[in-house]
Amino acid sequence: MTQGPFPKHIVLATDLSHRCDRAFDRALLVAKAWQAELTVIHALAPTEDVTLFGRLGELPSWRRPPDPVGKARDRIYRDLVREDPNIDIAVHVETGSPAPVVLEAARQSRAELIVTGVARDELLARMFLGDTVDRLIRKSTVPVLIVRDRAFEPYHNMLVATDFSESSRVALQTGVRFFPDASISLFHAYDVPFAGYLGRAEVEKQFQDYGKDAADKFLAEAGMAPESARGVSRMIEHGVPEVLLRDYAENSRRHLTVVGTHGGGIVNQALIGSTACKIIDAVPGDVLVVPDPAKRKAD
């Protein structure tokens, strides 16, 4: 597997709330490691044209509220300078719906990665995909890094969920390109049809053997050298993918989960219940979502 150049431009989608602080820190860490330009994008809700004192355009200057675009831009610059005054950054603030604003800004800047945070349910004390993140992973033609963990250090471990398809092969290649120093674990979950009517142990062994052979072929087709492939941990497990991955994430070292989307996949509104989407929502740590290669060609 040939290591390509790092992306030269990434974007961070932020709502300026504390929920996005972890995504902010991760974006800075990645931008420094890749020596990439970082564009911070924030979408503002449209302002009301009428105030208690009349229409904004008709008010004297001292009665007009501060320019919200300039205020948001100044806040972002202050935060970035406080974190690292030397990083190459751009700030894009625009009025509009968040997902379209982010996607269009990413397209215009030729970004190769979108970094974003997640919403939080304070009552249930769990992190979950918000509407904006959900729309980003449906419509983006570039990978989206969903950040839940604190960004203490670079990713050391990477878990690639695979069904041995072209989509998951591209996801693996993307993960290796982005984070070449991370160790790789390959994860495949399978179900045994008619398990109650068959000799379960024997059938499961057959599926295990198939999974190991398929994993070897998968890594070879991804362009991974034999010596590198031997260093990849294989997990061929029986069960529901998102349940197994969530359990593994909660009981193992911190890692980045990498998942590819299929054809229509989670891009298709009708397939929101797909395995990929369930994995993204279930895994408690960071997730790199790599769009289906056919979608990139179409765009």
Residue map of PLM features:
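Short, well-ordered secondary-structure micro-motifs
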Residues: 50-52, 127-128, 171, 196-200, ...
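Short beta-strand elements of ligand-binding domains
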Residues: 115-118, 144-149, 287-291
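Small/aliphatic-rich secondary-structure junction motif
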Residues: 2-60, 157-205, 224-227, 231
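Glycine-rich, Arg-bearing micro-motifs that act as flexible, cationic patches
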Residues: 113-135, 154-155, 256-282, 296-297
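Structural beta-alpha unit
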Residues: 1-6, 19, 26, 45-48, ...
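Short, structured interface segments
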Residues: 131-150
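General small-molecule cofactor/ligand-binding pocket signal
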Residues: 39-41, 90-94, 145, 185-187, ...
